[in-house]
Amino acid sequence: MRINEIAGSKLSFDTTKGSNTIGVEMNVDGQYAGMFQYDADSGRSLVELDPTFQSKGLGKILILKGIYTAIMSGLDYVEDESRTRAFDNAMDSLADAGYIVNDDEYWYVTGEGEQYLLKQVSL
C-alpha cells in the first residue's frame, strides 16, 4: 500500500462512538478526505472517500482505521454483505498485506496492521 502521492501530508482522524456504532472522519492537512461508518447491529459499513484523495492508498488506511476503531470500542467487526467491489478490493489488499485477518466472518486488525497505522498517524 502506498501514500507516496501525499508524502509530507498530515493525516488525522476524528472518531465518534455510539452504543453500537462508530464513525471515523479522515482529514489530510486539515482538509476532509473521507469517512467510515460502522453499525454493529446491522453489520453495515459505509465508506466515502473524496475523489481528490482516491487512488492514493488512503481508502485502505481509512478502512483499517475504521475496523481498528470498532474493535477498540468493543464492537465485533463482521463482514458486510452489501459491500462494493472497491471495498472488497481494499479488504483483500489489507488481508494480503497481513494487516487484517478474517476468523469465521469476524475481522481483526493484526499487530502488523496496528504498526502500519502507527506509521501513518497516531492512533
Where are the regions a protein language model picked out?
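Proteolytic processing junctions in secreted/extracellular precursors
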Residues: I3-G8, K119
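Conserved active-site tyrosine of GNAT-family acetyltransferases
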Residues: D88-A95
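Conserved beta-hairpin
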Residues: K10-A33
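C-terminal "cap" of GNAT-fold acetyltransferases
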Residues: D104-L123
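Conserved GNAT acetyl-CoA-binding A-motif
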Residues: A70-R83
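Conserved acetyl-CoA binding element of GNAT-fold acetyltransferases
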Residues: M35-F36, D41-T52
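Conserved acetyl-CoA-binding loop-helix of GNAT-fold acetyltransferases
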Residues: S55-Y68
